[in-house]
Swiss-Prot record:
Residues 206-235 form the IQ domain. Keywords: ATP-binding, Nucleotide-binding. Residues 344-378, 459-487 are annotated as: Disordered. The lineage of its organism: Eukaryota, Metazoa, Chordata, Craniata, Vertebrata. One of its GO terms (molecular function) is ATP binding. It comes from Mus musculus. The gene is Iqca1l. It comes from the Eukaryota. Pfam families: AAA (PF00004), IQ (PF00612). Belongs to the AAA ATPase family. This is IQ and AAA domain-containing protein 1-like. ATP binds at residues 572-579.
Length: 825
């Protein structure tokens, strides 16, 4: 696409953004609980709108070349991402589950399921800081040093005679197979001639034979033409894959090259812009700086004289903390200055009156407290009936960005800057403000001394110490106790290397979140209306990991604006891709991977003090080298109800207390995420596990839609020449594989598609029966195991709330039906 295309995309996005911002106030109004569905619908609409804006801003920021526009786009992109995370939090609070059925909203907005995909900003990987890249290189160097030299085993060689015998036997076997095939064909030919002779079949004349051949050939040719036309039509409407991918690949390659060339231009324009920033700053300081300095001095001297004429004394010069002379001369006249001074005098009088009023207020407060107690007792008796949206940190950022676009960029046309160069006028205005602020600080220091000299010379008065403004009384901000540094004399690099050598920091596999294959839930609203809690699909799990893990860890600004989530628990049977999701989060964000699994901690940092030191070092390095992911595999062992005898020597619970204490210290801006995975959560203490993990994601067996996509995508990913044909019934495979995990499906595909089978695909297409035998040898996830996990999940805090809400709905529905029956009678 051209530069103009991305400019139009940006303009259209702001039109949509303006409409969405107009809808925001309506969501802030409290809604009674009986209107839960309408409230959820409004939040869902906003959520989908912001998802679309996030997708557009991500594309525009990735391909926009003009450096000043990119800075504004970055702020808008982070703000919209923060708002998406806030609305996700609201949806969880309203739906009482992590899976949201938005199919009805999609239909009303005329969107497709693809619009539910959470876009991951490309700058997370493309604009990784030099520190992150240096850390990854350091990890690779340490691991290379630790890798033992692979000893080449001396394979026992064959003697010349044994080798000849082996080759001869293989060649004789090959010749025997060919001879047997040849003889089989000869016998078939003889058998056919014998049957013709026995049946007495008469020979055709030359004309009759020609007619028969023509009839057969024309029928065959017409069938081939019809089949070809049908295939072309099915390929055109997207029902069949196109066998010729050359044109499509060429188009994709051209688009990729265009994107890369624009990114190269971004780097060039950014370097030019940075160079221009320095030159503009120096130019303004040299040319306009002296005039600014003299003008400010004249203004401040005039203020001294006018204040002395009005009040009979020189004013107190404001200190730097309150803004210095900037606030005084922010478009103020001497008369306004006089009014400000009178206002200060009135404030002192008000203080006396306030003391008298305080006594009256105390009496009123006592009465109000009594009223509040009565109200609280009523509220306790009555359930909460109102839904409210929590205040947003992202909306002010989005509003500021939209206002800047409207005032600066909306009315400007690209024909002024066809080469996407920076706007020098806008740059000079920004730098002029910076130079003015720096010069004002210098002028304030000089004028304070001049004011001191004036007081001594005119009023014979020494400078009065200016009282610093008192802080308003109120509750003291709760200060967290600073954690004692147990390694003050150690550098971060040495601690990092120590953790790598011990095996607590590991290199993550290069897996993207899009590699976690799955399709969305299409009948969620139908299940919800039937008062059935829909189980999440693999698509929902992927989206939740993008929201809770990737978006928060990818950007410091997004993490600061979004609701704080410190830890995630992934619960599901073996083979569902829990570890793959952890590695995908690390890949998408460039995060460090710390492995605190109980099996990995065995024998490392023994003792109570050792466990404390271990957790301290891990969290210290994780905070200093953000972003970081702390993975706890088999996390049920850390929270065991009762440690099994065979695992007592491992002492899996030894870091539990220190881990919980360190996790509570994480605050907004600390891009550290704890992710636990477990297959047997029933063995863990429920309260401790749910208190530690703030978000619990249950991963059930894949449904039919996800299995269909899994079979299709995994088969196609086995090689460039692998294509699905009509001979392979993917739908049948998806039905047969009910109960099997993605790992089972991948194992069966890899067992069938060997190198030899891949070479035979041209002559012998794949059929479903080839996979069924390999799949049958694997043990599926039995329904009893999944039901056990579901029962555990419904005992979690969110699961209990959902079950209670569903029960209340069923009771209300039964009561309504009984009333209707009575009325009919």
């Amino acid at each position: 696409m051209s530069e103009g295309t991305y400019q139009r995309l940006w303009e259209a996005s702001h039109v949509t953004l303006e409409e969405v911002l107009e809808k925001e106030p309506s969501v802030l109004e409290p809604v009674p609980s009986r209107e839960r569905q309408s409230f959820q619908y409004r939040i869902s609409v906003l959520y989908l709108y912001y998802l679309g804006l996030l997708r557009r801003f991500n594309l525009a920021y990735d391909q926009m070349v003009q450096p000043q526009k990119r800075r504004l786009l970055r702020r808008l992109l982070d703000g919209v991402a923060g708002r998406v995370l806030e609305l996700k939090d609201e949806l969880v609070r309203v739906d009482l589950c992590e899976t949201h059925c938005l199919d009805r909203v999609l239909q009303d907005l005329k969107l497709t399921p693809a619009d539910l995909e959470v876009p991951i900003p490309k700058y997370f990987q493309l604009e990784q800081s030099s520190a992150v890249k240096a850390r990854q290189q350091m990890l690779a160097d340490i691991l290379n040093r630790l890798e033992p030299l692979v000893s080449q085993e001396n394979l026992r060689g064959l003697s010349r005679t044994a080798a000849l015998i082996l080759v001869q036997s293989a060649e004789r076997a090959r010749q025997g197979r060919l001879r047997a095939t040849f003889m089989r064909e000869i016998r078939k030919e003889e058998e056919r001639d014998r049957r013709i002779w026995e049946n007495g079949q008469q020979k055709f004349s030359r004309d009759q034979g020609a007619i028969v051949i023509q009839k057969v050939w024309k029928g065959y040719l017409q069938r081939k033409r019809i089949e070809q036309d049908r295939r072309v039509e099915m390929e055109f409407i997207g029902m069949l894959p196109s066998p010729n991918q050359t044109a499509r690949l060429n188009t994709l390659n051209q688009a990729f090259l265009g994107e890369e060339s624009r990114r190269m231009r971004q780097v060039e324009k950014e370097e030019e812009f940075q160079e221009a920033i320095g030159k503009t700053y120096e130019s303004l300081t040299e040319t306009e700086g002296p005039d600014m300095k003299e003008r400010m001095k004249d203004q401040i001297r005039q203020w001294f004289i006018e204040c002395h004429a009005l009040t009979g004394r020189f004013p107190d010069y404001p200190d730097e903390a309150s803004g210095g002379s900037y606030l005084i001369f922010a478009d103020k006249t001497p008369e306004q200055v006089r009014l400000d001074l009178e206002a200060q005098a009135q404030e002192s009088r008000k203080k006396d009156q306030e003391k008298k009023e305080k006594n009256k207020e105390k009496e009123k407060e006592k009465k109000e407290k009594k009223k509040k107690k009565v109200k609280e007792e009523k509220v306790k008796k009555e359930p909460e009936v109102m839904f409210r949206v929590l205040p947003s940190k992202s909306i002010p950022v989005i509003n500021a960005g939209h206002e800047e676009y409207t005032s600066v960029w909306k009315s400007r046309y690209d024909n002024k800057h066809p080469s996407q160069n920076f706007d020098s006028e806008t740059l000079r205005e920004e730098k002029r403000k910076q130079v003015e602020m720096e010069i004002r600080v210098q002028v304030d220091e000089l004028m304070r001394q001049e004011l001191k000299n004036l007081r001594l010379a005119v009023d014979r008065e020494e400078t009065r110490p200016l009282k610093s403004p008192k802080k308003k009384g109120g509750k003291k901000s709760g200060k967290k106790k600073k954690e004692k540094d147990l390694t003050p004399d150690r550098s971060v690099d040495s601690l990092f290397e120590e953790l790598v050598i011990i095996g607590l920091i590991k290199k993550s596999a290069l897996v993207t979140l899009s590699d976690y294959i799955g399709d969305c839930l299409y009948l969620g609203s139908t299940l919800t209306l039937a008062n059935k809690m829909p189980m999440p699909s693999l698509f929902d799990i992927r989206q939740n990991m993008a929201l809770y893990g990737v978006l928060r860890l990818g950007s410091h600004d997004i993490h600061t604006m979004a609701p704080l989530v410190r830890s995630i628990l992934l619960v599901g049977p073996s083979g569902m891709g829990k570890k793959m999701l952890v590695q995908a989060v690390c890949t998408e964000t460039g995060a460090n991977l710390f492995d605190l699994s109980p099996d990995n901690l065995m024998g490392k940092y023994p003792g109570k003090n050792g466990a404390q030191l271990l957790v301290h070092i891990v969290f210290k390095v994780a905070r200093l080298l953000q972003p970081s992911v702390i993975w706890i595999g088999n996390t049920e062992k850390t929270f065991y109800k009762k440690v099994p005898k065979e695992e007592r020597t491992m002492d899996p619970k030894r870091i539990k207390k220190d881990l919980m204490r360190a996790t509570k210290q994480l605050s907004p801006g600390d891009r550290v995420m704890l992710i636990g995975t477990t297959e047997r959560p029933q063995l863990a203490e429920m309260k401790g596990l749910c208190r530690f993990y703030e978000r619990i994601l249950f991963i059930p067996r894949p449904d039919y839609a996800s299995r269909y996509v899994l079979w299709k995508r995994m088969i196609e990913s086995q090689g460039r020449g692998v294509q699905l044909t009509s001979s392979l019934d993917v739908s049948a495979l998806a039905r047969v594989s009910d109960g099997y995990t993605p790992s089972h499906i991948l194992q069966s595909i890899q067992s069938v598609l060997t190198e030899r089978r891949l070479l035979q695909l041209i002559k012998k297409p794949l059929v479903a029966s080839e996979f069924v035998g390999h799949l049958a040898r694997l043990d599926p996830v039995y329904r009893e195991e999944e039901e056990s996990l579901k029962e555990w999940f419904f005992k979690t805090p969110l699961g209990k709330k959902n079950m209670k809400f569903t029960k209340d709905q069923l009771e209300a529905e039964e009561a309504r039906l009984t009333k209707e029956k009575k009325k009919k009678k």
